Each structure stands twice: as C-alpha cells, then as structure tokens.
C-alpha cells in the first residue's frame, strides 16, 4: 500500500473513532540547504513562504495532566527562492539567473505537548515528528519549469522534526510557534552535504 493510500485509510479510521479533534492552519517560512549535483552549495537561496494545514485528534491513546499526545494528517508547503536576478553579461545580453521551488507535501504526524504554565492561559512546549511525501512540486529556473517529482532530492519519505511553544487562550483557541527541520530519510546522517529544509512556522489551532 502506498503512503498516500495509507494516509487516506488513516483519516477514515481516525474520524471513525474520534470524539474530539482539531484543525490547525499555519504560515511557513522555509530555507533550503541545497547542494547541486556538482557538489556546489547554492548560497543565493532565500527563504520563502508557504501554508500549513493539519487535522488531528488529541489524547486518543492516553491522557494525563503532565503530557498531551496528538496524531493526525498534514499538508505542508515548503518553498524557496533564489538567484542573482537579471543583469548584463560581456556580450550585452540579458542574463536571468533565478530559482523558485513550490512544493506540497502530504503526511501524518505524531506530537507531544508538555504544559509549563497553566494560570488563566496555558503555555506548553511541543515536539513531534511528521512523515510525508511530495504530493506536487515545481522548480522554476529562469523561464524553465521542472517537475520535482522527477528529482532525486524530493523522492521518498521526508521526516520533519519539530519543537516549539504554544499558548492556549481558551478551550477552543491555541496559537503556536515552531521550528522544523525536514530531510529525506535517505539523507539523515549525511550532514550539510544532503538536501534539507529549515522552517519557521506560526499557527492557529481550532479545537472542537
């Protein structure tokens, strides 16, 4: 069974047993750490924005006052831009050297939340793991567009590790900030020579 079919099966099973659930929307700002096939790092890459959507359930398997557990499904956009823009070479011709990545990943997540303050509002430390695959992606180099599904850097399962803080202002509304690191499972342990992503995320969670 492919991971995309597994996610669909997970969602159907998830809502069959769900009694309380949440919807989380967020904004991502992602930086790529990218080395091309010639082992040259692209120093001109810049962070770019994207969106995040999650649906999940808390405390499905266990519930304590000291820790909260959440599982669910996610859709994430990890994007980047770069290049030196437009200029003139020695022949007087205009040279365009620009890059743009637009991606959509779909996956499942597993998170823990540990409260550190609970006086009127609740503040918690959050950590978690997201396993995802590229659903759709395009790379634009100057005026040429390439399908990232054909790129070895984006094939396979990606692992995203997360750590952050959240503020729950009432039983239904929670705001969060997280730092996330994403890498293909095949690249874990290879250091800076492998393609990876760092993302800053702000989010709003609506709890049912």
Map each language-model feature to its residues.
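Transmembrane beta-strands of outer-membrane beta-barrel pores
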Residues: 27-33, 59, 75-81, 114, ...
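Repeated loop/turn-to-beta-strand initiation elements of outer-membrane beta-barrel proteins
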Residues: 21, 63-69, 118-123, 171-175
